[in-house]
UniProtKB/Swiss-Prot annotation:
Domain of life where this protein originates: Bacteria
Subunit text: Homodimer.
GO BP, sorted A to Z: pyridoxal phosphate biosynthetic process; pyridoxine biosynthetic process
This protein's name: 4-hydroxythreonine-4-phosphate dehydrogenase
Cofactor note: Binds 1 divalent metal cation per subunit. Can use ions such as Zn(2+), Mg(2+) or Co(2+).
Predominant cellular place of this UniProt entry's protein: cytoplasm
Reaction(s) the record says it catalyses: 4-(phosphooxy)-L-threonine + NAD(+) = 3-amino-2-oxopropyl phosphate + CO2 + NADH
Positions contributing to a divalent metal cation binding: 166, 211, 266
Family the UniProt entry places it in: Belongs to the PdxA family.
Cell location: Cytoplasm
């Protein structure tokens, strides 16, 4: 890395395990400066509950970034709306969570931060606070005015991107249009090159129907939509293999010769990845004008403040963000 970069982190729901994980992250040295967008008392109280050392140093945007030393974090303060009891949701803090996301996103857009890593949020409590919120991905897409974003989850061994995300099954076939596939594959291909450093990405594409339609006998979306799009993009030089049946695609015969898989819908691709690497997975938002990674788990309210939360996914998310920063320099 040519110079030390700043990575901004949002802990997510303050009553969940996000603050625990941030404190655990701080117990090791990092080659980047970790700027945590959070309430100071929340972090110091949680560190005390866990019996771990934590020193907060103020964020100084005009000073050169410094590699993070063990036991310290750089704090970009955002005040809680209500005091926090670990494991107990407080509706007003839904506003606090969104404020942290907005500040972190804006900092990435204006060049303060090289990447953003998000901890788990509780969507229900944010909506209960009167803020329409469907998820991090949609929030950052709207705030950054990105034309289109793509959700991808990854482990060390496997990357799975989604053509559609949080849609009911009955709506998926209608949502998979030529325009959508062109856009999603273009973003996936571009970000594999620019953010992952893969010169010529090799992408496996799932069919929509069982057996990838069985030649039109189990649905015609492959013939009508997916195959024509893949043929057009192959003619442009993209290395695309598919459409392949999803029940046979996830095996070494195919995966050993691929850099990513494009699944047509959420529960087609993600169960395999989460079974293969749960606790080590990372959620990546492709198509944003900045690097964003996230943990692959929820708030785990029942574990907050008890010292039992597994920091593995957060460490993987941070390490991947650092690699992506290097690739984009």
């Amino acid at each position: 890395m040519v110079k030390t970069q700043r990575v901004v982190i949002t802990p997510g729901e303050p009553a969940g395990i996000g603050p625990d994980l941030i404190v655990q992250l701080a117990q090791r040295e990092w080659p980047v400066e970790l700027v945590v967008c959070a309430d100071a008392t929340l972090l110091t109280d949680r560190a005390a509950m866990l019996g771990l050392p934590l020193t907060l140093r103020p964020y100084s945007p005009n000073s050169p970034a410094q590699p993070q030393t063990a036991g310290t974090l750089t704090l970009l303060p955002v005040a809680l709306r209500e005091s926090v009891t670990a494991g107990q949701l407080a509706v007003e803090n839904g506003h606090y969570v969104v404020e942290t996301l907005a500040r972190a996103c804006d900092g990435c857009l204006n060049g303060e931060f090289a990447a953003l890593i998000t901890g788990p949020v509780h969507k229900g409590v944010i909506n209960d606070a009167g803020i329409p919120f469907t998820g991090h991905t949609e929030f950052f897409e709207e705030r950054s005015q990105a034309k289109k974003v793509v959700m991808m989850l990854a482990t060390e061994e496997l990357r799975v991107a989604l053509a559609t995300t949080h849609l009911p099954l009955r709506d998926i076939a209608d949502a998979i249009t030529p325009a959508l596939l062109h856009e999603v594959i273009a973003i996936l291909h571009h970000d594999l090159r620019t953010k992952f450093g893969i010169a010529e990405p090799r992408i496996l594409v799932c069919g929509l129907n069982p057996h990838a339609g069985e030649g039109g006998h189990m649905g015609t979306e492959e013939i009508d939509t997916i195959i024509p799009v893949l043929d057009e993009l192959r003619a442009q030089g993209m290395k695309l293999n598919g459409p392949l049946p999803a029940d046979t695609l996830f095996q070494p015969k195919y995966l050993d010769n691929a850099d990513a898989v494009l699944a047509m819908y959420h529960d087609q691709g993600l169960p395999v990845l989460k079974y293969q690497g749960f606790g080590r997975g990372v959620n990546i938002t492709l198509g944003l004008p900045f690097i964003r990674t996230s943990v692959d788990h929820g708030t785990a309210l029942e574990l907050a403040g008890r010292g039992k939360a597994d920091v593995g996914s957060f460490i993987t998310a941070l390490n991947l963000a650092i690699k992506m920063i290097v690739n984009t320099q």
